[in-house]
Amino acid sequence: AYFPEMVFGASACGRMMHEDIKALENVVIPAWDRGVELMKKAVELAPVCRKATAEKSLGVGMFFRAMLRSTLHNKKWFILNRRLEIENNFVIANQIMDDMLKIIEQEMKNVREVIPIAENDSVLGWEPRMDYQGGTWHLYWKIRQLENLRDNTLQVYRQTLSENVPFSRERTR
């Protein structure tokens, strides 16, 4: 069992975030991967009269696994973003940005994989307090946000990670 509140030294220092990442990567997501594979086999073996229900259940498992991956990506992003804010070495800062771009690509792949599942079952992504935060409209919106981050925001930010500024430093009066 995983009890995050029981991790010795977990405090505002950031250790908890790393413990969460370790648990997601080594325990939680692999367990969901195994569960999805078992459910795929169950769908194949399901009698015709239960196949539709079994397929919906498989979709729920796959959708939730995608949400776990999003959680992992968000936690990794948070850590890299904080490191980037305080990094004074341009080479290391650019390496951090490369890692951030990898996370964007992983999350875009994750979202694209779950869109057909959400389109097939409109109940997925609905949460009573937040409405359809995981519905297809929001999934496409998320892809647009990730593309903008990759193609615009991070590219402009990367230009600031150099002693050779790509624009004039002279001030106009």
Question: In which residue ranges do the predicted regions lie?
Answer:
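Substrate-binding groove of N-acetylhexosamine-processing glycoside hydrolases
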Residues: 1-173
